[in-house]
């Protein structure tokens, strides 16, 4: 039996080598790009003695887009160790993944997208104690669309209260550094030559960690850009009492509508960098308020960023 296993293993390695040879031949023509399946490693770099910290990548699958009405059906968190100065990721911990029964049928389009069915989640719940242990060791929580994930997570899991968050989709300058889209699957394909089965929380978490370690042409790491952004306070700008006919201008400028939940203003708002705010003030004055200053601006740090921005 051992000899047969060895024979089969050797055959598989030979087939794999043949496929790599074919892939290399195709790529050498310059007319083809070959995507390879992403297999998550447990380690990206060895430490060099520099200080390290722990971050946590999270992703949720939900019954819809509204954090008030919809529910989480899958949660995953993957911790990893990193060097805060260089942005190098060292070891990656095991994923903690949980399905949860939302107490209502999962919409058919969500099941088609995620593969998660009512039968899979029936009677299941997120282990809050396990999540609490996972979150306790992390100084930074990362999601690829934190404006979506954080409101769901904050409502469901008390362990995330007052944690610092960063958004790898918004806070890494993908377009400025030559990438036209911020979608996770596109980024992994375009930048790393890899594909994965997306729209399951654990796969998305591991794919994001891999993406954050792919250097840009200037040698900088996406994760270092993300860390620098997370450390820098931002402005949350509220276009209070903006005229109704200005809504399309504000939407084009990437403002979002707040319906007044949780004591927040009922107004259009946007979170932006300190540098962006300097030019935004002039635009608001001229385009929205007819030469006057009618907006409100608040400084926000990583603990307050993406709260209820779903």
What does each of the following model-derived ranges do?
Residues 124, 201, 263:
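Residue-level "edge-of-site" marker
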Residues 130, 207-208, 269:
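Short Asp/Glu-rich motifs
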Residues 156, 174, 190, 211-218:
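Active-site catalytic microenvironments for nucleophilic, acid-base chemistry
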Residues 3-163, 170, 177-198, 291-294:
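Conserved non-catalytic scaffold segment of RNase H-like nuclease domains
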Residues 98, 175, 237-240:
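Residue-level marker of alpha-helix boundaries and capping positions
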Residues 203-211:
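Acidic, divalent-metal-coordinating active-site segment for phosphoryl/phosphodiester hydrolysis
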